[in-house]
């Protein structure tokens, strides 16, 4: 049976939202994209071309795929422009209030397709609690960063009907991703592990270890170097996640600075 998803939408074009939209288009889906921030929309073409160039240098995308991608990656001036999508992925800030406002607006546009959220900390139950979303058409699909290079996607589908479950799972597999069913708990599997890892890395730094020592030790253990990873995280998102999870103290959180967002990284 062919998958009914042909056109997808993405709301929120930060680091992960942009890469998710890029992945959708790269895999042949018509991707309608929108962000409420004008700066995000204004920089969209430049970001797309920079990503294309990077993937071409690594031999991960052909010239024909590039031509198709440019046609399929379609900016929208508002949320109403996404209403025709068969599936919309919400990738806005880790804030339930903001997410619910997006869902309310989408409902007002007449959108009736499947809705997924890329949240890494807010539970599905929380987002369903106010009745804005149809639970039969709503799933949590948490991609991993960097989206274009990681395969696992955490999935929470709860009481969705079987046909919609199958549609979403097949869609993720078409993207070349491995859906992993996860319990609906704050932080899910990945962030539960990641936050413990992050706290311990910071504690080692406080105890006198050098950044390069911690990162090298992680590499020897076949783990992602923690401080190298921190420099790709957006501090505001980390703060939102840790507030929700209540697992990271403020003094540890203060170490999360990145070159992209603060003008300096851990090496500085």
Q: For each predicted feature, which ranges?
A:
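N-terminal glycine-rich phosphate-binding loop for ADP-containing cofactors
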Residues: 1-268
């Amino acid at each position: 049976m062919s998958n009914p998803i042909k056109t997808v939408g993405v709301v929120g074009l930060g680091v992960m939202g942009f890469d998710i939209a890029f992945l959708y288009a790269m895999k042949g889906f018509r991707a309608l994209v929108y962000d409420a921030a004008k700066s995000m929309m204004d920089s969209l073409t430049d970001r797309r071309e920079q990503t294309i160039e990077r993937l071409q240098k690594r031999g991960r995308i052909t010239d024909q795929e590039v031509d198709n991608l440019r046609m399929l990656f379609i900016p929208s001036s508002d949320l109403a422009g996404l209403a025709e999508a068969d599936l919309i992925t919400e990738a806005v800030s880790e804030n339930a209030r903001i997410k619910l406002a997006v869902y309310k607006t989408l409902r007002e546009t007449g959108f009736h397709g499947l809705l997924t959220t890329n949240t890494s900390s807010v539970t599905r139950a929380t987002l369903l609690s106010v009745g804005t979303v149809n639970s039969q058409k709503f799933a949590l699909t948490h991609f991993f960063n960097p989206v274009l290079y990681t395969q696992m996607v955490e999935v929470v589908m709860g009481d969705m009907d079987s046909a919609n479950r199958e549609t979403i799972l097949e869609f993720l597999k078409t993207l070349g991703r491995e859906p992993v069913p996860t319990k609906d708990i704050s932080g899910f599997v990945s962030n539960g592990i990641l936050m413990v890892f992050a706290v311990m890395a910071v504690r080692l730094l406080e105890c006198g270890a050098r950044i390069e020592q911690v990162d090298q030790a992680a590499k020897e253990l076949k783990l992602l170097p923690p401080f190298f990873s921190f420099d790709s995280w957006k501090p505001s998102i980390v703060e939102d996640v840790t507030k929700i999870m209540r697992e990271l103290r403020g003094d540890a959180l203060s170490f999360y600075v990145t070159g992209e967002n603060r003008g300096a990284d851990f090496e500085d």
